């Protein structure tokens, strides 16, 4: 795959990615994160495409169709994939469409929260004994509404809204698919070419080049209705990437080496005519890096060492205000090393242990430096041009024990970050911002030295072959060492318990039925400072019950029909998530039931 480059500075900016077009999800942790540059040492999630159908002696076509309906927001969705292969050639085309209207919490509707998404992609490939070449092109469009009830012009009313934590009943309307200002829309185009050259049995060279273009427009309510259809933000981001990677195998100690160079050039431009200062300025940025990842094995011990150097240079210019035309022209240069050492030891057939320690850094993002404006339609953001790079280290320890019926896997981590970048609610006069569309809480970027400590545990039990029980727990403690208080907006403790049952039926085992039920309990967050929040208390603890039932019919020639019923928050719990900034205005989504049909042919 290729790293998505978009205007990802908004918590409400969903990644412009069609998840239905990816057949494999890969989670990368440990020393292997060194491949993906600064900011990736915590782990990387990859959405990978399945290999194209090469080597068919005759022209062969197969595909799939997926259709679904969601009760919450009355959403409809449909996707289809068609792929063909003949000898050394393979191709795949994919399309997806989703549409939904206003969604409901457990108690009330949230108007103007509809969405429309359209995605198209095509992939062509060639493969012979030594060369594999692919060309991928995709386009993704999304339009999503923003709940308008966060527009409140009176400060006393805004504070009362925070205390109530839910909309005024008089502002609620009937369900609709219409999307009116405030809303946002974006379009993302990607083209990627990749060549894998198998030099010999032990050496391979990978070359990847890509271009991405991201268009984003954001609309807000203005004084006059006709002005509301003029975008407040109108941006285009262009990204050019070129990566080269060499992979080698060595016969001594089963060693492997992966060495690569990564180059990225970006240009961001704000179209004029918005009558509003740009949220992020115009900029050009060049990032270059080189890495090496070396692995070896000595009996039961496996080890990996990764080293990387990156630098990033940015040229920035923009206006902080249109009223006095305050212009700035800035230049930033960041560089540093990243390293990681990982080990895995097989103590016995049933027990293994792993450890990883890494030193990493991250330069501030463009929004953290220069942002000024409304985000998520609900709070005002102010960047900090004086931010430095984050630097720190992280140590992870874990182990796993298993037998034929039971397994348990605990892990823990300790992380120290100097100059950690985060945003917090302003104090005094900086607590709220007065804007023509309303009054909003103000979040200001800052940095301090912090410590993060946490862990998780997962236990799996199979009392009988078709039944699997899984229990999980997750904890994280974030402490601000510079100010000697808790870090704001850190996740609460989470606990989960799930059960899944799968049964193969029929004389020819052509039917597969499965049921799963899962419960998630999220504790009340007590590790926070009430004086540095907009409300004096954190949301209550909550419990969510989810379930899935599906029935598959296997047909000749690897064809299949599957029916699925998925339930989220089936008890229709009214709850809030502590880390969600929108919790000051409303609750999370209520119950949703999805009915889906998948046909493979």
Which ranges hold each PLM region?
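C-terminal beta-signal and adjacent terminal beta-strands/loops
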Residues: 361-362, 416-418, 423, 469, ...
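Short strand-turn segments of transmembrane beta-barrel domains in outer membranes
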Residues: 44, 49-84, 95, 110
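Outer membrane beta-barrel strand-and-loop segments of large Gram-negative receptors
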Residues: 233-245, 289, 382-388, 394, ...
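Short acidic/polar hinge/loop motifs at secondary-structure boundaries
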Residues: 3-29
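Gram-negative outer-membrane beta-barrel transporters
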Residues: 413-416, 435-525
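Periplasmic-side early beta-strands and strand-to-turn transitions of outer-membrane beta-barrels
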Residues: 46, 81-181
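Face-selective signature of the C-terminal outer-membrane beta-barrel domain
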Residues: 127-141, 175-324, 328-340, 344-346, ...
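Surface-exposed extracellular loop regions of Gram-negative outer-membrane beta-barrel proteins
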Residues: 150, 265-269, 311-322, 331, ...
């Amino acid at each position: 795959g290729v790293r998505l480059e978009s205007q990802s500075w908004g918590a409400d900016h969903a990644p412009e990615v069609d998840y239905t077009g990816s057949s494999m999800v890969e989670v990368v942790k440990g020393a292997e994160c060194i491949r993906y540059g600064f900011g990736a040492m915590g782990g990387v999630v990859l959405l990978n495409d399945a290999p194209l159908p090469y080597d068919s002696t005759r022209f062969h076509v197969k595909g799939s169709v997926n259709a679904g309906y969601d009760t919450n927001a009355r959403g409809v969705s449909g996707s289809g994939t068609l792929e063909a292969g003949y000898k050394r050639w393979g191709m795949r085309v994919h399309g997806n469409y989703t549409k939904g209207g206003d969604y409901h919490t457990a108690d009330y509707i949230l108007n103007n929260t509809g969405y429309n998404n359209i995605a198209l992609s095509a992939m062509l490939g060639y493969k012979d004994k030594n060369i594999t070449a692919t060309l991928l092109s995709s386009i993704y469009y999304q339009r999503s509404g923003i709940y308008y009830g966060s527009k409140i012009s009176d400060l006393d009313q805004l504070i009362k809204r925070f205390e109530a934590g839910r909309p005024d009943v008089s502002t609620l309307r009937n369900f609709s698919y219409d999307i009116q200002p405030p809303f946002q829309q974006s379009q993302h185009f990607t083209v990627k070419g990749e060549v894998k050259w198998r030099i010999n049995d032990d050496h391979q060279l990978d070359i990847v080049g890509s271009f991405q273009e991201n268009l984003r427009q954001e609309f807000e309510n203005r004084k006059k209705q006709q002005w509301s259809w003029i975008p407040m933000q109108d941006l285009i981001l262009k990204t050019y990437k070129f990566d080269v990677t060499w992979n080698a195998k060595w016969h001594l100690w089963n060693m492997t080496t992966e060495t690569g160079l990564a180059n990225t050039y970006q240009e961001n431009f704000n179209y004029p005519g918005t009558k509003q200062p740009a949220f992020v300025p115009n900029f050009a940025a060049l990032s270059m890096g080189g890495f090496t990842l070396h692995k070896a094995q000595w009996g039961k011990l496996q080890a990996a060492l990764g080293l990387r150097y990156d630098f990033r240079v940015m040229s920035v210019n923009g206006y902080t205000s249109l009223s006095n035309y305050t212009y700035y022209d800035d230049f930033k240069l960041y560089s540093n090393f990243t390293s990681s050492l990982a080990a895995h030891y097989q103590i016995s057939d049933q027990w293994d242990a792993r450890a990883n320690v890494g030193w990493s850094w991250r330069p501030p993002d463009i929004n953290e430096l220069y942002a000024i404006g409304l985000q998520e339609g609900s709070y005002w953001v102010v960047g900090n041009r004086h931010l430095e790079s984050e630097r720190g280290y992280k140590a992870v320890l874990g182990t796993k024990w298993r037998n034929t019926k039971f397994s348990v896997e605990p892990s823990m981590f300790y992380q120290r970050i100097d100059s950690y970048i985060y945003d917090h609610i302003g104090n005094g006069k900086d607590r709220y911002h007065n804007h023509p569309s309303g009054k909003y809480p103000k979040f200001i970027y800052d940095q301090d030295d912090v410590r993060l400590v946490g862990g998780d545990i997962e236990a799996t039990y199979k009392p009988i072959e078709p039944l699997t029980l899984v229990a999980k727990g997750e904890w994280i403690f974030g402490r601000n060492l510079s100010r000697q208080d808790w870090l704001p907006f850190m996740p609460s403790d989470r606990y989960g318990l799930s059960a899944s049952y799968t049964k193969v039926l029929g004389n020819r085992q052509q039917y597969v039925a499965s049921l799963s039920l899962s419960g998630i309990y999220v504790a009340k967050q007590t590790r926070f400072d009430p004086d540095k929040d907009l409300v004096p208390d954190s949301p209550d603890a909550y419990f969510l019950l989810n379930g899935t039932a599906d029935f598959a019919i296997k047909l000749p020639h690897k064809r299949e029909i599957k029916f699925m019923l998925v339930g989220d928050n089936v008890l229709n719990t009214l709850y809030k998530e502590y880390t969600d900034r929108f919790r000051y205005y409303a609750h999370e989504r209520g119950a949703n039931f999805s009915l889906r049909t998948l046909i493979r042919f």
